[in-house]
């Protein structure tokens, strides 16, 4: 309010020429006021008639510049309002010996300044229920309300500023607003900021972990992509090998055709060579016979002439058949090769596409229906051996790796009582009957080592026995075994059970200290042949909250 009044008042004290507060104001006959220096400079620039810069009234001669005394006094008082008074020096009220020292702290509730050496002395003085509120002496002016000249000890929730009690309760600007003590609000803000700081630190740590995981995943993907590139290169080398094989077969076709032609050509040449030898032989005989005709005694016997003439007539009587020459139709052969090239080019020119994206970003922790990250970490800590359920290697993983989610967390969804074959469900490889989540004893591990022998038990007719290694109970692989009661429990099962993740105390450790991984099935069966074999089918301890398969 006071600030607005000052601004409005200042607008009436501004010179129209320099637009600042009047400096030695003078008044013209038209009753307009200007700074003496401003109006003098304005008229000095105008060589013609002098005019009032505000109303443009012309004067034949320059009027006298009379000082406006009333306006001068108002300007001086207005300027005095803007002059900040030097703050009064505060001295310690507890200094008794010698002159008091300058105050370093001021208690806003007690309004008592104190020096640095008497801060503890002041804090030990009795105060209001809210206690002392010390601030720096230099900040006292900032904590003072300019309107009521009182310390601002309250915090307005509506406007988020510190206010004094008069602003809150006595028709002040913050009347009706929700306020609280400034120290209480400060503690609340500190708690809120500390809580947010913890959240931000956790978020920063989470982001840092995710960045590390992203970097690790990047390196892993780069390695796998490099492996994939090598495999792709090998595949393309196989394609090159196929092309080389096709080229070899094509060249082989040409070689076979050439060999066939050369064979036919050689046969023709051989036949013509034989005809030539025969003709040369007859020609020689004919020449010798012609030489004999010079003697008249030749005419005594001319039978040789007739024989030679007949043979010559036979040789020359038939015409020579034209030879068969080779005709290579290269265009026809190249057309067939061009067809293959066209088909291959058409196949390779198409974009390389896969049915689904082969490299994509997926959530880091895929959430199951009945699982959570905390449970997974808890389970992995309690049962590190259960990791074989997630792999396909080993006898159990190969048989029950895809048996569903009933035992994926190693936890039964039903309360555990005396075990029956309808609890802790998994699917056997050969059927869909629900059985205990445990491996079937391999037939090869029984005493005689036969691959066809089944564990023959007198009271259970040779049915396969399934083991739940957490609840330490047995059941038959047959889901409905004629209404047979669950196997009774006992405290004589020969292995120790880990105590972590159990919601109940375990009974004393059995007398046999051998652990499950070191106990062979043969030892179990040997133990079943002893007089106390009925305890072999009983369970050890109380039901646990988790069931998982073991081998």
UniProtKB/Swiss-Prot annotation:
- Return the Polar residues bias intervals: 405-424, 446-456
Could you identify this protein by its name? E3 ubiquitin-protein ligase TRIM8
How does a null allele present? Mice are more susceptible to LPS and bacterial-induced death. In addition, TRIM8 deletion plays a protective role in hepatocyte injury triggered by hepatic ischaemia/reperfusion (I/R) injury.
- Positions of the region Disordered? 399-457
Instruction: Give the SUPFAM superfamilies listed for this entry.
Output: B-box zinc-binding domain (SSF57845), RING/U-box (SSF57850)
**A Pfam family per the record:** zf-RING_UBOX
GO-annotated biological processes? canonical NF-kappaB signal transduction; host-mediated suppression of symbiont invasion; innate immune response; negative regulation of viral transcription; positive regulation of autophagy; positive regulation of canonical NF-kappaB signal transduction; positive regulation of protein localization to nucleus; protein K63-linked ubiquitination
Residue ranges that the Swiss-Prot or TrEMBL entry lists as coiled coil: 181-249, 274-295
Entry EC no(s):
2.3.2.27
- MF GO annotations: protein homodimerization activity; transcription coactivator activity; ubiquitin protein ligase activity; ubiquitin-protein transferase activity; zinc ion binding
Gene Ontology CC, one term: nucleus
What ranges of residues constitute the B box-type zinc fingers?
A: 92-132, 140-182
Source organism, top-level taxon: Eukaryota
Outline the subunit composition: Homodimer. Interacts with SOCS1 (via) SH2 domain and SOCS box. Interacts with HSP90AB1; prevents nucleus translocation of phosphorylated STAT3 and HSP90AB1. Interacts with MAP3K7/TAK1. Interacts with PIAS3. Interacts with TICAM1. Interacts with TRIM15; this interaction prevents TRIM8 cytoplasmic translocation.
Q: What is known of its domains?
A: The coiled coil domain is required for homodimerization. The region immediately C-terminal to the RING motif is sufficient to mediate the interaction with SOCS1.
Described function: E3 ubiquitin-protein ligase that participates in multiple biological processes including cell survival, differentiation, apoptosis, and in particular, the innate immune response. Participates in the activation of interferon-gamma signaling by promoting proteasomal degradation of the repressor SOCS1. Plays a positive role in the TNFalpha and IL-1beta signaling pathways. Mechanistically, induces the 'Lys-63'-linked polyubiquitination of MAP3K7/TAK1 component leading to the activation of NF-kappa-B.
- Tissue expression: High expression in heart, liver, and thymus. Expressed in embryonic CNS, kidney, lens and gut.
Similarity comment text for this entry: Belongs to the TRIM/RBCC family.
Zinc finger (RING-type) positions are 15-56
Pathway this chain belongs to: Protein modification; protein ubiquitination
Alphabetized, the UniProt keywords read: Coiled coil, Immunity, Innate immunity, Metal-binding, Repeat, Transferase, Ubl conjugation pathway, Zinc, Zinc-finger
Catalytic activity reads:
S-ubiquitinyl-[E2 ubiquitin-conjugating enzyme]-L-cysteine + [acceptor protein]-L-lysine = [E2 ubiquitin-conjugating enzyme]-L-cysteine + N(6)-ubiquitinyl-[acceptor protein]-L-lysine
């Amino acid at each position: 309010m006071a600030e607005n009044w000052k601004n409005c008042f200042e607008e009436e004290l501004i010179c129209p020429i320099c637009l600042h507060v009047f400096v030695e104001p003078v008044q013209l006959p038209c009753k307009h006021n200007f700074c003496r220096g401003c109006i003098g400079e304005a008229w000095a620039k105008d060589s013609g008639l002098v005019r009032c810069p505000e109303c443009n009234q012309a004067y034949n001669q320059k009027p006298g510049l009379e000082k406006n005394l009333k306006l001068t006094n108002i300007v001086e008082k207005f300027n005095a309002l803007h002059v900040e008074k030097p703050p009064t020096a505060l001295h310690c009220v507890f200094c008794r010996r010698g002159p008091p020292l300058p105050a370093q702290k001021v208690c806003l509730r007690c309004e008592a300044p104190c020096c640095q050496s008497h801060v503890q002395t002041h804090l030990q003085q009795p105060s209001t229920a809210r206690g002392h509120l010390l601030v720096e002496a230099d900040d006292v002016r900032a904590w003072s309300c300019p309107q009521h000249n009182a310390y601002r000890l309250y915090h307005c929730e509506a406007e988020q500023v510190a206010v004094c009690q008069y602003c809150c309760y006595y028709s002040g600007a913050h009347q009706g607003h929700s306020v609280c003590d400034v120290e209480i609000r400060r503690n609340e803000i500190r708690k809120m900021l500390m809580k947010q700081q913890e959240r931000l630190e956790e978020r920063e740590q989470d982001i840092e972990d995710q960045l590390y995981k992203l970097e690790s995943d990047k390196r892993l993907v780069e390695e796998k992509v490099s492996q994939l590139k090598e495999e792709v290169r090998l595949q393309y080398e196989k394609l090159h090998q196929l092309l080389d094989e096709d080229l070899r077969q094509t060249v082989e076709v040409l070689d076979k055709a050439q060999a066939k032609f050369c064979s036919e050509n050689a046969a023709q040449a051989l036949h013509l060579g034989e005809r030539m030898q025969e003709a040369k032989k007859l020609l020689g005989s004919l020449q010798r016979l012609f030489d004999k005709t010079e003697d008249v005694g030749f005419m005594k016997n001319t039978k040789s002439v007739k024989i030679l003439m007949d043979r010559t007539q036979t040789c020359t009587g038939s015409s020579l058949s034209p030879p068969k020459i080779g005709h290579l139709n290269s265009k026809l052969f190249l057309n067939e090769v061009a067809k293959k090239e066209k088909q291959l080019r058409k196949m390779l020119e198409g974009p390389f596409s896969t049915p689904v994206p082969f490299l994509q970003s997926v959530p880091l922790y895929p959430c199951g229906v009945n699982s959570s990250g905390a449970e997974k970490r808890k389970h992995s800590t309690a049962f590190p051996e259960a990791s074989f359920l997630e792999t396909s290697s080993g006898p159990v993983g190969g048989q029950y790796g895809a048996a569903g989610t009933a035992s994926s967390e190693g936890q039964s969804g039903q309360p555990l009582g005396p075990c029956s074959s309808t609890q802790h469900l998994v699917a056997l490889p050969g059927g869909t009957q629900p059985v205990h989540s445990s491996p079937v004893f391999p037939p090869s591990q029984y005493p005689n080592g036969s691959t066809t022998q089944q564990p023959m038990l007198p009271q259970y007719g040779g049915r396969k026995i399934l083991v739940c290694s957490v609840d330490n109970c047995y059941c038959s692989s047959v889901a409905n075994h004629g209404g047979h009661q669950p196997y009774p429990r006992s405290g004589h099962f020969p292995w120790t059970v880990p105590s972590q993740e159990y919601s109940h105390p375990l009974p004393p450790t059995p007398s046999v200290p051998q652990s499950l991984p070191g106990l062979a099935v043969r030892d179990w069966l040997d133990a079943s042949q002893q007089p106390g074999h009925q305890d072999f089918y009983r369970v050890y301890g109380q039901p646990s909250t988790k069931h998982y398969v073991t081998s």
